[in-house]
């Protein structure tokens, strides 16, 4: 069973979301997602300043097996990207919940968080897959 940190929120598409300060959230892909994808070779990051809607594909994780879209779990503005992934995409594999984060978003509608899963619900989703 994959590691599912209790303090995070999750999407059904296997993104995680961690609350930071001032309505900003860090986004990455879950340990389960990176296990399915395999070794990362490239991450196509979104543009800082881009405005996205919840569910928009805004990044791509490319692995030795496949390329997978990464979706915005909430609507808002991309305020930072993890530039370290340009040289070290494998951080998504080795540190999916830490150094392997993908982007930070300033949420425009925090009520959208209510549609995300908590750790218990995400674990149940994984059991059903």
From Swiss-Prot:
Query: What protein am I looking at?
Result: Glycine cleavage system H protein
Q: Which Gene3D superfamilies match?
A: 2.40.50.100
A single GO BP: glycine decarboxylation via glycine cleavage system
Q: What does this protein do?
A: The glycine cleavage system catalyzes the degradation of glycine. The H protein shuttles the methylamine group of glycine from the P protein to the T protein.
Query: Which family, according to the similarity comment?
Result: Belongs to the GcvH family.
Q: What does the note under cofactor report?
A: Binds 1 lipoyl cofactor covalently.
Q: Which UniProt keywords apply?
A: Lipoyl
- The protein's assembly and partners: The glycine cleavage system is composed of four proteins: P, T, L and H.
SUPFAM superfamilies from the UniProt entry: Single hybrid motif
GO CC annotations, alphabetized: cytosol; glycine cleavage complex
- Sequence positions bearing N6-lipoyllysine: 65
Coiled-coil segments? none
Where is each Lipoyl-binding domain found?
A: 24-106
Q: Which cofactors, if any, are listed as required?
A: (R)-lipoate
Q: Per its UniProt entry, which superkingdom is the organism in?
A: Bacteria
